[in-house]
Each structure stands twice: as structure tokens, then as C-alpha cells.
């Protein structure tokens, strides 16, 4: 990491994920500053609070007295144009610079160096975004760990628990998946998993951190875990199908998120289902940090 000289004009891109936030400041001379912190305190459904959180992050990351030339943000759980616009207006008022706020999945296409395509995130949660020919944004999926986020870490754990409960109801002995979940949640038996999941105060984060249990169980031979992963991959592919049905160009599907990129079993399931459902779609794993897309969007404001 290099420090940006206080006098050098800079653009700031921010990727606010479900768990981690990455700010990147790029100076006119090419100097780059990276600042990473947790996303604790991010409240995207309160525009004033979200803007204040972002402004504090900018001041925390940049040298004292430095004002960026432009700021672009991709925010987790920024789900509608109206919501994003509210945060943008409040942030622009606080920083007095050009600002743009979009959902975090919208960072993927520009991060990949593309002008159009689909951005699909499967990290703690899952969501896919694209744009119609007139530039209007379209988002599908998401909805949080309780109702949706299929194929994301939290959704996989939820579905794994459901699979373990169903096996228990069929009278089956606990397999590697059930035993792994019991150990991870610190309970004594499968029926106690329900209370353990319901006691979470931060559902997405607390469920999602146990996703490695699902993949470990699959590697150990659990048919239940393998089915959960396969269904997760199909759910991710279904997000792309929904975008295509709504008129979004889905030739290029830029994929990011630790759940899908760090776990070949999930990525392979997604790619196989996508090839079957939308033969012309090309999955493209993102090989650079999504914050690069925010930097690109910030530059476009100048």
C-alpha cells in the first residue's frame, strides 16, 4: 500500500460488502491507497446514516485535509434506484464532490473492463444485476438470508440445515453434514439446530460463517451436502435466467464472491446449470477486487 500525497487529486471507489468494506483511492499520478475494514455499522436503508458512515470512512482513509475529486460506492443491500439515490444525495452534500451509489454487484462489470453484462455476487448473500438497452438497472435475487440469498454462504447453511432436518424426520442417522452443523452451532442434536439458527443476531454473518461445513461434508462424502451445493449452483444460474427473461443482455456473466469463487464445487455446479439454461452466456470469474469497478465509476464522474 502507498500513501496518497495530500495535494494530489484523487478518485475514491468503495466496495461495501456484507462483511468487509474495501476503499481504494487512486491519485492522478497513479499512487494507490487501499483501506479495508469491517462493514459493521453499515445501514443502507437509512440514507443519512449510510452517507455519514461513508463520509467517515473517506476521512478515516485519506490524509487529513484531503478532499477527493469524486467518490463512487457499490453498497451491499442497496437494492433500488430510489434507495441508492437517497444515499448519493446525502453523501454528495456531506463531501461536496460528485458521487455515485449503486448496488455492490454493479461494480463487477466495470471491474472486469466491460461496458455491459451481468454482475453476479455469491458471497455472504447472492444477487445478480444487469441493465436494459435503455440503461435502466435490473436486480434479481438477494432478499436476505431468511427469505433468499440462495447460493450464498448464509443461504447454503440454511438449506443445509433444512436438509439435515428432513433426513432426521425420515429416521436417518446424522451424516457428515448433520454432524458438522451440530458441531459448528454448538448443539447436541439435529432438532436443536432450529433454535441455534433463530438465535442469531446478525443472521447473514452468523449463518454464513458456517458455510465451510457444507463443503467439508460434501468432500467427506455427504450426499445431502452435495445436493445442497448443486441446488445452490442451480439457484445462481436461475438469477441469470431471470435477467435474460426481463431483457437484459447476459452474454457475459461476471462472477464474484467468496462463496462461489473459493469453492470449485459451487462454481462448477453454477457453470453447468448456466450452460444448460442459457447456452450463450459466458461465466467470467472476476480476478481483480470489485473495488476496481468503483474506481472506474468514480473516474466516469469527472
Give the positions of each predicted feature:
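ATP-binding/phosphotransfer module of carbohydrate and carboxylate kinases, centering on a glycine-rich
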Residues: 1-68, 90, 95, 111-118, ...
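Short active-site-proximal "capping" loops at secondary-structure junctions
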Residues: 40-44, 76-78, 107
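Alpha-helical substrate-recognition element adjacent to the catalytic core
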Residues: 52, 74-79
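Glycine- and acidic-rich phosphate- and metal-coordinating loops
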Residues: 68-74
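Solvent-exposed beta-strand sheet faces enriched in polar/charged residues
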Residues: 74, 102, 254-256
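Phosphate-binding/catalytic loop of phosphoryl-transfer enzymes
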Residues: 78-174
